[in-house]
A protein has these predicted regions:
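N-terminal secretory signal peptides and thylakoid transit peptides that target proteins
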Residues: 17-36
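N-terminal accessory alpha/beta regions
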Residues: 72-182
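Amphipathic alpha-helical segments that form the core helices of the histone-fold
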Residues: 73-92, 204-215, 386-392, 550-554
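Flexible, low-complexity segments enriched for small/polar residues
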Residues: 48-72, 358, 362-393, 402-574
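Intrinsically disordered, low-complexity segments enriched in serine/proline and basic residues
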Residues: 3-9
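Acidic, Ala/Val/Gly-enriched low-complexity intrinsically disordered segments
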Residues: 11-14
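Active-site substrate-binding loop specific to GH73 endo-beta-N-acetylglucosaminidase modules
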Residues: 200-214, 218-434
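Sec/Tat signal peptide C-region and signal peptidase I cleavage site
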Residues: 42-48
């Protein structure tokens, strides 16, 4: 859907061999660029000497994981692809490695409740407002009104960054690879944008509470969890939606009447699909049904102290979702042909039940799953079977995934898929055998590659086809990343700089500048990893790298060989 950095998409490159350089490469990497340009953009699934079992193992690791890490190919070949898939479908049975569990335990945000996160953000916003007022009132006052303001901004920046830490650490190192792939898929399906206000601090909670527990559970449970999470309520503004006249009665300055954003997107994107048979009137009626679905309000600390209520028992529940009957439209409604009698919050629960069980929802989700795991153009017969399985099991996502991986369409290695930037970066780090304690450079790389983590501003999420991601500039950026990673120039084991800018926007810019320096320096920066061993890399990837590419690698200067593997057309497909 989105071109890379505004460049026009060039889907034709996906269909034709490349006989000239794909794009101007960095001149000091001329040897790598010349060799990469000579390779042909076509499927390179090589099952000759490696054998059918190894090829099948590679296939499932590329489709159901973020590619093989060292030892994965041998392990899956020995145990069999079917046994590995059965293991992946029950991630709760797989223990996390101690190093990963330790890094996750060190994160602060997962221990914070929604209420605490929202309170911190609002107190930061209040401090910023007071500082701005002070600057306006006094020309020589150029600093925040209190030292607390700077501390608060640092806390918010840490929460913002920890969402990415938690996601990437698990995607790279967890043995529960299918779960991680599905977390990415379903977060993208129920997308929220981390850059919007309150969602700066809520995205981690949203993924941990509303997405991750449900990726192999019931779709209805995930639909309800996302609908009620404050990250979604805030992102699509349903927390402000009120029945006509309610704002005047309650004097709610921020409530501007009926808001249709969530009602529209939950049908168009989350359930029925754009061709799901609903009308604009259905959107309006569903918006009326969902009035009153909001967040419990928490006043900033300064106001609580002023009112003598700082220690008031406001509760420490995990959720701040609340139904406000004074905002709800209690009139009769007709939606999707259903007469909906007044029933408060249960009207919304009825609507979500109906959407989760609708045949159009089954088909829409089946099509998206087939596109993600099988082909850019989903096979119609597979979509039919997955939709039927979804309906027969009342939206059991584990059963649907089992049907998908058992299908002949999934087992067929053709056609191949072109990796998104997210898949490319993760698979490159995993294949290189790098155990990272600092994923922030990878977050910066994802931004440079056009797919910032949690950075899709529109509710439809990132698209997942070759036409969306294959263009000359994008390939140039990928080769540059492959070169920096392979040569050990990325500081993936660097301890965070305590003097980094406090704001998350400044922090991301600093990471991007650091990534730029890493890409152009001849020498690794502090905290960089060792150069990638090309022999170990080729052993890890096995039949993924074609005979032709291996020959090109052998003719390349040793210092560039691992970069050529990671920047090859073979590696950019899965």
């Amino acid at each position: 859907m989105r071109p890379f950095n505004g460049q026009p998409l060039n889907a034709r490159l996906a269909k034709t061999p490349m006989t000239r350089p794909i794009a101007p490469m960095l001149t000091r990497r001329g040897a790598l660029a010349a060799t990469a340009a000579a390779l042909v953009w076509r499927p390179a699934f090589a099952a000759d000497a490696a054998g059918v079992d190894q090829a099948e193992a590679l296939h499932v690791l590329n489709r159901l994981a973020f590619g093989p890490a060292p030892g994965d190919l041998d392990r899956v070949t020995q145990m069999g692809a079917r046994a590995w898939i059965a293991e992946q479908l029950h991630p709760e049975r797989l223990a996390l490695p101690a190093w990963l569990a330790g890094q996750l335990d060190a994160l602060r945000t997962p221990n914070e409740t929604q209420r605490e996160l929202v309170r911190q953000y609002r107190e930061m916003a209040e401090e910023a407002k007071l500082a701005k007022q002070a600057e306006t009132a006094s020309a020589d006052s150029k600093k925040p009104a209190t030292a607390e303001g700077g501390d608060r901004r640092r806390q918010i920046a840490a929460i913002y960054a920890e969402a990415g830490d938690e996601r990437l650490l698990q995607a790279l190192g967890s043995p529960r690879q299918l779960q991680e792939v599905l977390v990415d898929f379903w977060f993208n399906h129920f997308n929220v944008y981390q850059g919007k206000g309150l969602d700066r601090v809520l995205v981690e909670s949203y993924e941990r509470e509303a997405i991750r527990p449900h990726v192999l559970g019931r779709f209805r449970a995930m639909l309800g969890a996302t609908a009620k999470h404050p990250a979604m309520l805030f992102y699509l503004d349903n927390w402000l939606s009120v029945a006509p006249g309610t704002q005047a009665r309650r004097g709610a300055a921020k409530a501007s009447g009926l808001n249709e954003n969530y009602a529209r997107e939950v049908m168009e994107l989350h359930t029925l699909g754009v061709d799901g048979g609903y009308t604009q009137q259905d959107v309006t009626e569903l918006a009326r049904i969902l009035t009153g679905w909001t967040m419990q309000q928490e006043r900033p600390r300064r106001r609580r102290v002023a009112d003598g209520m700082d220690n008031a028992a406001s509760g420490r529940g995990d959720s701040i979702f609340g139904f406000d009957p004074t905002r709800h439209d209690n009139g009769p409604k007709t939606w999707l042909g259903h007469a909906v009698a007044p029933g408060g919050q249960m009207e919304g629960e009825f609507a979500l039940d109906a959407l989760a069980r609708h045949p159009a929802t089954a088909r829409h989700l089946a099509s998206k799953l087939a596109r993600r795991f099988v082909a850019d153009t989903p096979p119609p017969a597979l979509v039919d079977r997955l939709a039927r399985r979804f309906q027969d099991t009342d939206g059991d996502l584990r059963a649907v995934m089992q049907a998908l991986v058992d299908s002949p369409e999934f087992r067929d290695p053709q056609p191949v898929k072109f990796k998104t930037p997210y898949q490319f970066v993760l698979s490159a780090v995993r294949a290189s055998g790098i155990v990272t304690s600092n994923v922030k450079p990878l977050m910066a790389q994802l931004t440079q590659l056009g797919q910032p983590l949690y950075g899709c501003q529109t509710p439809d999420g990132w698209h997942d086809t070759e036409a969306d991601w294959l263009n000359p500039n994008a390939i140039t950026q990928r080769v540059n990343f492959a070169t920096a990673l392979a040569s050990g120039k990325l500081p993936l084991q660097r301890v965070d700089d305590p003097n980094a800018p406090a704001g998350e926007a400044n922090g991301m810019k600093a990471m991007e500048r650091q990534a730029d320096r890493a890409m152009t320096r001849d020498q690794p920066v502090e905290g960089s990893t060792a150069p990638v061993d090309v022999g170990a890399l080729l052993a890890t990837l096995g039949p993924a790298i074609s005979v032709k590419t291996r020959a090109a690698v052998a003719d390349t200067p040793p210092a560039l060989r691992a970069a050529l593997v990671l920047g090859s057309p073979d590696f950019m497909r899965r």
